[in-house]
Curated annotation (Swiss-Prot):
Pathway: Cofactor biosynthesis; (R)-pantothenate biosynthesis; (R)-pantoate from 3-methyl-2-oxobutanoate: step 1/2. Binds 1 Mg(2+) ion per subunit. It catalyses: 3-methyl-2-oxobutanoate + (6R)-5,10-methylene-5,6,7,8-tetrahydrofolate + H2O = 2-dehydropantoate + (6S)-5,6,7,8-tetrahydrofolate. Its EC number is 2.1.2.11. Belongs to the PanB family. Its cofactor is Mg(2+). This is 3-methyl-2-oxobutanoate hydroxymethyltransferase. Homodecamer; pentamer of dimers. The gene is panB.
Length: 275
């Protein structure tokens, strides 16, 4: 019998080297069971602060805490052995100073064992990104639409149509690449600009609502699986529709319990002989 094939966990360096070679497959993961299911199929799993909305029912990501991200990062690491695992830095955990960013990012790395952190921001965060990278913390950048800054841009909308807006996003991506990030998310950005940035910078671009022009794609798993139903962004394709199945299963369970058909004899522990 042949020995099972053991695959090493992908590293940020491997992800970076995928630019122009093979599209990077990425999804979000927040729990151990789901991470186990996604791990064999993904190059990168993101423990996203989107968990605040899809798991906890928050209206935005702004109330997500560092402790929450660490707890879910630990859960995802327990369920993975192949994908590169990156943990989002939540709002307020890195913007104050590069020293604050390092202190909190180091805690995330130490307490979860993840492969790197993701933070939002462009030119204004480049110094922080460089500071972290020089101290051994791989950084996944995030430009374009940045959910942690949604209140300053007037809500969730696509960006990059005007020259000024496009120029800002272009400069942001260049700054993050030059600062040493191993890859960068481009979110909610028009296709021509995403294509231009992908050709312009030497690190992979991972798109979410930025077209197939990017070097890879990421989606929120609960969107992709049809579990999160509060709203559906235009860029989401539902590859499954699990919400109705969950509801139907709960309905069937409730019906059997009320009719005393569950548990049946096959689900009951019998008394020991002679008891």
């Amino acid at each position: 019998m042949s020995a099972p094939v053991t695959r090493k966990r992908l590293t940020p360096k491997v992800i970076q080297a995928m630019k122009g070679e093979c599209p990077i497959v990425s999804l979000t993961a927040y729990t151990t069971p789901v991470a186990r299911l996604l791990d064999p199929h993904c190059d990168l799993l993101l423990v996203g602060d989107s968990l605040g909305m899809v798991l906890y029912g928050m209206e935005s990501t702004l109330a997500v805490t560092l402790d929450m991200m660490i707890m879910h990062g630990q859960a995802v690491m327990r369920g993975t052995s192949h994908a590169c695992v990156i943990v989002d830095m939540p709002f307020g955990s890195y913007q104050e100073s590069k020293e604050q960013a390092f202190r909190n990012a180091a805690r995330v790395m130490q307490e979860t064992g993840c492969d790197g952190v993701k933070l939002e921001g462009g030119e204004e965060m480049a110094e922080t990104v460089a500071f972290l990278v020089r101290r051994g913390i791989p950084v996944f950048g995030h430009v374009g639409l940045m959910p942690q800054q949604v209140n300053t841009v007037g809500g969730f909308r696509s960006l990059g149509r005007g020259d000024d807006e496009a120029g800002k996003i272009r400069r942001d991506a260049q700054a993050i690449a030059q600062a040493g990030a191993f890859a960068v998310v481009i979110e909610g950005t028009v296709e021509p600009l995403a294509r231009e940035i992908t050709a312009l910078i030497d690190i992979p671009t991972v798109g979410i609502g930025a077209s197939s022009a990017c070097d890879g794609q990421v989606l929120v798993s609960d969107d992709m699986l049809g579990l999160f139903q509060d709203f559906t962004p235009r860029f989401v394709k539902r590859f499954a529709h699990l919400a109705p199945q969950v509801s139907q299963a709960a309905e069937a369970y409730a019906e059997e319990v009320r009719a005393r058909r569950f548990p049946g004899p096959e689900h009951v522990f019998g008394a020991k002989p002679g008891a």
